[in-house]
Design a protein with these regions (language model features):
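Conserved small-residue
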Residues: 8, 26, 82, 97, ...
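Conserved catalytic cysteine-centered active-site region
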Residues: 35-76, 104-154, 179-206, 221, ...
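Short glycine/threonine-rich loop-to-helix capping motif typified by GTGT followed
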Residues: 241-247, 277-294, 312-317, 351
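Alpha-helical metal-binding/catalytic segments enriched in His/Glu/Asp
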Residues: 152-156, 210-218, 316-323
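Structural signature of cysteine-dependent C-C bond-forming condensing enzymes
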Residues: 87-98, 126-137, 160-167, 189-198, ...
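Conserved active-site "lid/cap" helical segment
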Residues: 15, 20-100, 106, 254-266, ...
């Protein structure tokens, strides 16, 4: 089976418009989460949102001003993420273009009596692909909050099946009234900055971001970074439309399968980048899963305290930050965690610390019972 590598990546978030600025902000403990007015005639919510003015300035730095009105706010975020990668890697007729998103241009629906074409995820993917000159039909991965992790898996499996030689994966979602209203109806949104795994956690903060990665089976010798995608799995727990299996069955099976394919034991995993939404049931289910897999002593964090829950972007964005941790031999703390609030022990990272990181486990879970896991190895 071909070995698959991630050799390049980028991200656009409230903490910065490239990986370097994001990493610097994380080392300084900065968070994008703040109070923002999202819904008219409703109190502000704690969300992680990109400043509109800064986004416009950044877009005009890299793209012709005549193009400004041709793209939605989310599309501009996608273009900014992808542009550096497309400039560094050649697109061929054997290159896949994979889009991960949960809601795409859902904001286009507001105040519309008919369905705008741009709201279709396939149309969004095609528009982005056409702009950069991709020659293959785009692939859309939209499976709730595991979409970003699954997009990496899809790229890996498609290349190993010899359907493509390489792939550009881009993932993203934006803060919208639609999404905020939906999560609020579940009473899942926290009334303060989120505290994954903490005793006093009371819900999620939503966020927005885009992230992009280049994945190939033929890395060049001079790549600045190189991570093998060693194993992957996605299992549905078939429990409930909005609640995970209380015993973590779906996530357990996903982690077990991914580690088996990677031929990695619990002792070999150096770091877990977990989903950690700060909801009561998700965090508890993860703690049970990691203990079932004998991973309770592995250093673990959730990035939700920095970025909020970025939906379709979260899995890819958090994988990128995990790889940066490995490159810089630095573990980032799980922000806002103070006191253990799950029934089983976890090794929650509490402060910046040096560590040799070779094997990374990245997990995600979401509505509809979906779960996904990948194992990455520093090459």
């Amino acid at each position: 089976m071909k070995e698959i590598y991630i050799t390049d990546y980028n991200c656009v978030t409230p903490l910065g418009f490239d990986v370097e600025s994001n990493w610097k902000a994380l080392l300084e403990g900065k968070s994008g989460v703040a109070l923002h007015k999202v819904i008219d005639n409703h109190d502000a919510f704690f969300v992680s949102k990109i400043d509109d003015e800064k986004l416009e300035i950044e877009f005009k730095r890299f793209f012709d001003s005549a193009q400004n009105d041709n793209f939605t706010r989310l599309e501009k975020m996608f273009l900014l993420s992808l542009k550096p990668l497309v400039e560094r890697h050649q697109i061929s007729d054997e290159t896949a273009f994979i889009l991960s998103t949960t809601k795409g241009n859902i904001s286009l629906l507001k105040n519309e009596s008919t369905l705008p074409e741009g709201v279709y995820l396939s149309r969004l993917a095609q528009k982005l692909a056409d702009f950069f000159g991709f020659k293959t039909q785009p692939i859309v991965v939209s499976n709730a909050c595991v979409s970003g992790v699954m997009a990496i898996s899809v790229a890996k499996n498609m290349i190993q099946a010899r359907k493509y030689k390489d792939a550009f994966v881009v993932a993203g979602d934006e803060i919208s009234e639609f999404v905020i209203s939906g999560f609020n109806s579940f009473q899942a949104i926290g009334s303060e900055p989120c505290k994954p795994y903490d005793k006093n956690r009371n819900g999620i903060n939503l966020g927005e971001a885009t992230a992009a990665a280049y994945i190939t089976s033929t890395p060049s010798a001079n790549e600045k970074l190189k991570f093998k995608v060693l194993g992957d799995s996605a299992i549905n727990d078939a429990n409930h439309i909005s609640g995970p299996s209380r015993t973590g069955d779906g996530l357990f099976a996903s982690v077990q399968n991914a580690m088996k394919e990677a031929k990695a034991s619990a002792e070999q995993i150096d770091f877990i980048s977990a989903h950690g939404t700060a909801t009561l049931y998700n965090d508890e289910m993860e703690a049970i899963t990691f203990n079932r897999m004998n991973l309770q002593n592995v250093p673990l964090n959730s990035m939700k305290g920095y970025y909020g829950h970025c939906l379709g972007a979260s899995g890819l964005l958090e994988s990128i930050i995990a790889m940066e941790s490995a490159l810089n031999n630095t573990l980032i703390p799980s922000k806002n965690f103070e006191e253990m609030g799950v029934s089983q022990d976890l090794n929650i990272i509490r402060e910046n610390q040096s560590a040799e990181i070779k094997y990374i486990l990245k997990t995600a879970s979401g509505f509809g019972g979906c779960n996904a896991a990948i194992v990455l190895g520093k090459a």
